[in-house]
Amino acid sequence: MAFTQALVTVLAFLVGTLPHKFDFSENSDLKKANGDKCVHHSQCFSDCCLIDLERSGAFCTSKSHVGMACLPQTKRSLNILCPCRIGLSCHSKDPMCPRRCQMI
């Protein structure tokens, strides 16, 4: 079970580093709703494609709310944590604690 989860994680990171053959531009009318399967964050209306090991894949989900763990920005195709919603910033007051969404 642990090996399978590790393999899924490694494959997800590799997919994030490969060039994509599809057009996932911001102007695309094919944006997916929360809960739909995705392979790139720009496919999602929320702009967050989150890896879900329990459901064996990646799915569109909303960005992080106040107090939720976050990433400062989306760099690859898939997210382990989502960036913050508009109006919130992702930072940590303590370098030993994970980043959280907070009011600007």
Swiss-Prot record:
It is found in: Secreted. Residues 1-19 form the signal peptide. Disulfide bonds join 38-49, 44-60, 48-82, 70-90, 84-101. One of its GO terms (molecular function) is enzyme activator activity. GO terms for cellular component: extracellular region. It comes from the Eukaryota. Keywords: Disulfide bond, Secreted, Signal. GO terms for biological process: digestion; lipid catabolic process; response to food. Its main location: secreted. Gene3D superfamilies: Lipase, subunit A. The keyword Secreted applies. Belongs to the colipase family. PANTHER family: COLIPASE, COLIPASE-LIKE PROTEIN 2. This is Colipase-like protein 2.
